C-alpha cells in the first residue's frame, strides 16, 4: 500500500493485495473484512465493510462503495459515484447490475477469511 499526503483509514481484517493511492486532499477509508485484489488503483474513496474489489479495478476520487459489494475485475468506478449496499458492479464505467445474493455475501466473507488464515499461517514462518 502506498500513499502520499492522504488520510488513510483501514478497517480490521482488511486484505490489501498491493493497491496504490496517490491522490491528495481526499479521505481514503476501507471498512472491515474488505478484500482488495491485485493491481487495483484506488483514489481517495470509501469502501464499505465486507466488500470485494476485483483484480485491476479502478475507483476514483470521492467514490463510495457500500457494504457487502462485489466490484468486478477491471471495473471503473468514476468520480463521486455512489454504489449502494449489496451491489454487484461490473464494466467501464461500472454499473450496478443487481443485488448480490446471500451466497455471494457469504463467499466474500469466506474469501477474506481464507486470506487472513493464510497470512497468519505464513507470517509465523517468516517472522
Locations of the language-model features?
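C-terminal segments of enzyme domains that contribute to small-molecule binding surfaces
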Residues: 10-24, 30, 35-36, 40-41, ...
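Left-handed beta-helix
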Residues: 2-3, 7-8, 20, 26, ...
Amino acid at each position: 500500500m502506498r500513499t502520499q499526503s492522504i488520510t488513510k483509514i483501514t478497517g480490521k481484517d482488511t486484505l490489501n493485495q498491493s493497491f496504490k493511492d496517490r491522490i491528495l486532499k481526499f479521505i481514503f477509508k476501507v471498512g472491515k473484512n474488505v478484500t482488495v485484489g491485485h493491481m487495483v488503483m484506488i483514489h481517495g474513496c470509501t469502501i464499505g465493510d465486507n466488500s470485494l474489489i476485483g483484480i485491476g479495478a479502478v475507483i476514483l476520487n470521492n467514490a463510495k462503495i457500500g457494504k457487502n459489494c462485489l466490484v468486478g475485475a477491471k471495473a471503473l468506478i468514476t468520480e463521486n459515484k455512489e454504489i449502494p449496499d449489496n451491489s454487484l458492479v461490473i464494466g467501464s464505467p461500472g454499473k450496478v447490475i443487481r443485488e448480490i445474493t446471500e451466497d455471494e455475501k457469504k463467499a466474500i466473507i469466506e474469501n477474506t477469511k481464507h486470506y487472513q488464515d493464510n497470512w497468519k499461517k505464513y507470517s509465523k514462518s517468516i517472522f
